[in-house]
Amino acid sequence: MSDLASLETSILDQIAAAGDEAALEAVRVAALGKKGSISALLATLGKMSPDERKTQGAAINLAKDKVTQALSARRDVLKAAALDARLAAETIDVTLPLQDTPADTGRIHPLSQVMDELTTIFADMGFSIAEGPDVETDDYNFTKLNFPEGHPAREMHDTFFFNPKEDGSRMLLRTHTSPVQVRTMLSQKPPIRVICPGRTYRIDSDATHTPQFHQVEGLVIDKGSHLGHLKWILHEFCKAFFEVDHINMKFRPSFFPFTEPSLEVDIQCRRDKGEIRFGEGEDWLEILGCGMVHPNVLRACGIDPDEYQGFAWGMGIDRIAMLKYGMSDLRQLFEGDVRWLSHYGFKPLEVPTLAGGLST
């Protein structure tokens, strides 16, 4: 009995001294495991006489129960201590400011924002979006758009040409998005109502010009389309884009090879200390070019000009973005300065809508 009491005391002391659950498990295995000390005593009961088995069995089982209870109690203590330590290590200081999420810190580039605004406005008028390749043929970029041979726009100082092919033909980086209009007229039957936003390229670089820039053009082809429709579309666009209730416009005669008649559009504005306010004042600002599609362009695209007529317009997305949001240097749009983008960019979840506001 004295040996059992000593063993029990030793095991209970080891349980109390266990500093973590791993050490406690080692004590349990040493005492109650298959080859444990108490398990070994229980195995000897079969060799005892009935009287000894009765006395020793009760004592050994009592010791086993005490060890089991002690193990359970110590395990609860160690689990609680481990949880307290983890909570202490992962303490959150509720007085610290919340960390910004990517949706809070990220910004939509002004050009992407303006493209979304443009597509929102024209989609509301029933226009669809047409796209085409940046690398174009001379035929689509010039010939089918009524640019005659020898036109200045074909010269190397305006256009990025690739090396000539074996047959002498040359590919180029499109100088406007008008080739998308050509592709649309060749692939679709009238009526047509599309806008063509995208990148364009010309050899030029200063504060108001870059070798790569963005344009959006619009095209309407139908049997009854006329300049009155064009004027209404552009008037409604300018009101919606510049977010004013009223705006005056002037249409001036101009020349573009692909339209006849050709017009340039000025809108009313007021210049005040470097800022431009639209819809008020006595100044005028050129905003875009437009006109009725030239009959030669319609014929080149397989459309009978005696049955259909249409109008088109085009504007620089970079320029109208600068005018609307007060940016002074076009080159900054392409420099990737995070500080600049943080100032001029837009929150990614504020999608422009006509109902909710384009630039809010």
Swiss-Prot record:
Chief location: cytoplasm
Biological process per Gene Ontology, one example term: phenylalanyl-tRNA aminoacylation
Compartments reported by the entry: Cytoplasm
Cofactor: Mg(2+)
EC number: 6.1.1.20
Keyword list, A-Z: Aminoacyl-tRNA synthetase, ATP-binding, Cytoplasm, Ligase, Magnesium, Metal-binding, Nucleotide-binding, Protein biosynthesis
Broad enzyme group: ligase
Catalytic activity: tRNA(Phe) + L-phenylalanine + ATP = L-phenylalanyl-tRNA(Phe) + AMP + diphosphate + H(+)
Pfam families (alphabetical): Phe_tRNA-synt_N (PF02912), tRNA-synt_2d (PF01409)
Cellular component terms per the entry's GO annotation: cytoplasm
Cofactor note: Binds 2 magnesium ions per tetramer.
GO molecular function, one term: magnesium ion binding
UniProt-annotated binding residues for Mg(2+): E260
Family that this chain belongs to: Belongs to the class-II aminoacyl-tRNA synthetase family. Phe-tRNA synthetase alpha subunit type 1 subfamily.
Subunit field text: Tetramer of two alpha and two beta subunits.
Name under which the protein is recorded: Phenylalanine--tRNA ligase alpha subunit
Gene: pheS
